[in-house]
A protein has these predicted regions:
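Short, well-formed alpha-helical segments that are part of the catalytic scaffolds
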Residues: 11-26
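Donor nucleotide-sugar binding loop of glycosyltransferases
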Residues: 11-14, 42, 70, 96
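Membrane-interface starts of transmembrane alpha-helices
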Residues: 259-268
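Conserved donor nucleotide-binding strand/loop of the catalytic core
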Residues: 32-37, 47-80
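A conserved acidic beta->alpha catalytic loop
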Residues: 39-47, 93
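Hydrophobic helical membrane-anchoring modules
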Residues: 1, 147, 170-251, 255-256, ...
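Acceptor/aglycone-binding surface of glycosyltransferases and processive sugar-polymer synthases
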Residues: 62-80, 85, 97-175, 199-209, ...
Length: 291
């Protein structure tokens, strides 16, 4: 069974179109499947519209009133899914529903555990993207190359074998649940070419906050992937601040207090050592301390 997860917020017009489109793909390809709409309590009635399809097609709707956000909605979808394979896609029709069979086939054939819809492989692309948006997408992808080999790390179109999520602690921030799953599970991944289309109805959710969340999320994933390297970087940063503290205390005691430079140096050194010890303990090596 295939579970298609649609995270939604104010997608009333699009949900009317995407659910019948998915139903047609299931019927044409003889796929046994369901659609799970996880809605963040949309004021435009998205959840109610989605529920209306339940009489003719296996659609389940879950409305979340707290802890909102795209990635958290998808995680709830994983929890609710009855299928062995979960397909995650945007509800705004930017991801081609006709590609669902291509997304699940490699997993069913045992070739991989995750497929990711890619705009950056042969056969993929994006309709009418301006140069600036292409540059932002490429730049965001390059920043993620240290944690994944995906050709399109910022993709939101994914199929995943649900069993690989068992025991994996997913803690996404923002909207890149695909990147979270791929990095945390270290699964076998296959790229599937897709042509991305901009939404026709509704407003994009990609604002400044989403971009900042992406950078913060990347920081978490780098820390997960390279924990020792991160501790080393923190240790070096604390060392630099300790040098500043040492110098500031020394200058203050000599120039403003008039203390003998030899005694001032000893006091400054002791202060810097204490500073470094405290901050290394509570920040640089916090993971080891909590373990």
């Amino acid at each position: 069974m295939i579970s298609v997860i649609l995270p939604t917020y104010n997608e009333a017009e699009n949900i009317r179109r995407i659910i019948p489109a998915i139903a047609k793909v299931f019927q044409d390809e003889k796929i046994q499947g369901e659609v799970i709409v996880v809605d963040d309590d949309s004021p435009d009635g998205t959840a109610g519209i989605a529920s209306e399809f339940g009489n003719s097609f296996p659609v389940r709707v879950y409305v979340r009133k707290s802890d909102r956000g795209l990635s958290k909605a998808v995680m709830k979808g994983f929890e609710l899914a009855r299928g062995e394979i979960c397909v995650v896609m945007d509800a705004d029709l930017s991801h081609p529903v006709e590609k669902i069979p291509d997304m699940v086939r490699p997993i069913l054939e045992g070739k991989c555990d995750v497929t990711v819809g890619s705009r950056y492989v042969v056969g993929g692309g994006a309709h009418n993207w301006p140069l600036v948006r292409k540059a932002i997408s490429k730049g965001a992808g390059l920043l993620a190359k240290g944690v994944t080999v995906l050709s399109d790390p910022t993709s939101g179109f994914m199929a995943v074998r649900k069993s690989i999520l068992n025991g994996v602690k997913l803690d996404p921030l923002g909207w890149k649940i695909v990147l979270e799953v791929v990095v945390k599970t270290r699964a076998r991944v296959t790229d599937v070419p897709i042509v991305f289309a901009d939404r026709e109805e509704g407003e994009s959710k990609l604002g400044l906050k989403a971009q900042v969340d992406y950078l913060r999320h990347l920081g978490r994933l780098y820390a997960f992937r390279y924990p020792l390297f991160l501790e080393f970087v923190k240790f070096c940063l604390v060392g630099l601040t300790g040098l500043v503290v040492d110098t500031a205390v020394l200058v203050s005691l000599v120039d403003y207090v008039g203390l003998d430079p030899r005694f001032a140096a000893l006091f400054a050194f002791a202060t810097a050592v204490s500073w470094n010890y405290v901050f290394n303990r509570v920040w640089s090596f916090e993971s080891g301390r909590s373990a």
